[in-house]
Amino acid sequence: MARTVIAIVDDLFFASKIRGTAEQAGVAVSFPRGIELLKEAVARDQPSLVICDLNSQRINPIEVAQALKANERTSHIPLLGFFSHVQTELQIAAEQSGFDRVIPRSAFARFLPQILSGTE
């Protein structure tokens, strides 16, 4: 079964970078545009990873983490959030809400191939 990743990303540059890197790695990726679409995608795809831009305006990343971690069918899915390195309060909030990993945007970009392939 192919690795599947769901990405919650508003920034078109990062979405394009994720899509291109996923294609090269043979990883299926989807970009739901709302909380209901996210829930449907998670139930349908049972992703290996959910990536979330912690600055997303479309979907509240803190609510995403709380909802996924509270549901026994989705609580095992790893959540990775990325943020601007100066937003330490956002990092703390994400960690407290259930994100398994929270990394600066620069590290996310640098290690994207490994993150998507599950080797990092």
What are these regions (language model features)?
Residues 3-12:
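Conserved acidic segment of CheY-like receiver
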Residues 26-33:
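Short hydrophobic/Thr-rich beta-strand motif most characteristic of the beta2 strand and flanking loop
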Residues 69-75:
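Conserved phosphotransfer cores of two-component systems
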Residues 98-110:
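Output/docking surface of receiver
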Residues 76-85:
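A short, hydrophobic beta-strand element within the central beta-sheet of small alpha/beta folds
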Residues 52-68:
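Conserved phosphotransfer microenvironments
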Residues 86-101:
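Alpha4 helix (beta4-alpha4-beta5 surface) of REC/receiver domains from two-component response regulators
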Residues 34-49:
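Acidic, metal-coordinating helix/loop segments flanking the phosphotransfer/catalytic sites
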